[in-house]
Amino acid sequence: MKKELHLSFLKAKKLNHQANSERALILRQQYGMKMLEMLQHNRRILNVDETWVNETSFIRRAWAKRDGSGNTILSRVSPRISMITAIDTDGRVWFALSHANTDSKMMALFLHSLTEAMDTEIPGYSDSITILSDNAKYHQSQETRDVIKALGIRLIFSGPYSYSSAVAEYLFGGLKTSEINPDHLPTTKR
């Protein structure tokens, strides 16, 4: 069939990645052991992460004729949308959307708003919740840590390259697998 349609593909090279360095493996193992311990003690894990959306079609490649382009036409979103998400082990999800770049101040604002929402939805939540965060600079910043401490919530950072243990990454992956604006509504200020 490939020959009939004049299709071809390129074999991808395997890249050497730091994900399997001894340090990364040990840190992931320690992180995994700590997570299992918290789950055994019925801690609620709240995965907080962020992404941004600058287009509505995330389909990157398509089959094409040998001399044709395999790229798809992108549908831009301008200005881009920043999304901060929190999802807990019970499946509750909280979103914040903005046009601002995510930084320590935006993370602090999100955490304050999140705890206000959780005060009404989950009384006594701070006794049982641990925030799981990746190692982004604004997650590690002193400002963010001070806010989390002031809110009385525990914090754990994931091990390096631990995407598969962060449920927010799966949520973002599901969002970014296809066309999120199938009706092609306007997505720019112009």
Predicted regions located by residue number:
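Short, solvent-exposed loop/turn segments at secondary-structure junctions
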Residues: K3-L5, N16, T51-N54, D88-R92, ...
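Conserved short alpha-helical interface segments
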Residues: M1-E22, R44, E50-V53
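Extended, low-complexity cationic-aromatic segments
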Residues: L25-S113
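RNase H-like two-metal-ion nuclease catalytic core shared by retroviral integrases
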Residues: S133-N135, Q142, F157-I180, K189
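RNase H-like polynucleotidyl transferase catalytic core
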Residues: K13, G70-S75, K149-Y170, H184-L185
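Short, basic/hydrophobic alpha-helical segments
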Residues: A108-D127
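Short coil/turn segments at beta-strand junctions that form active-site/ligand-binding loops
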Residues: N42-R43, S126-I129
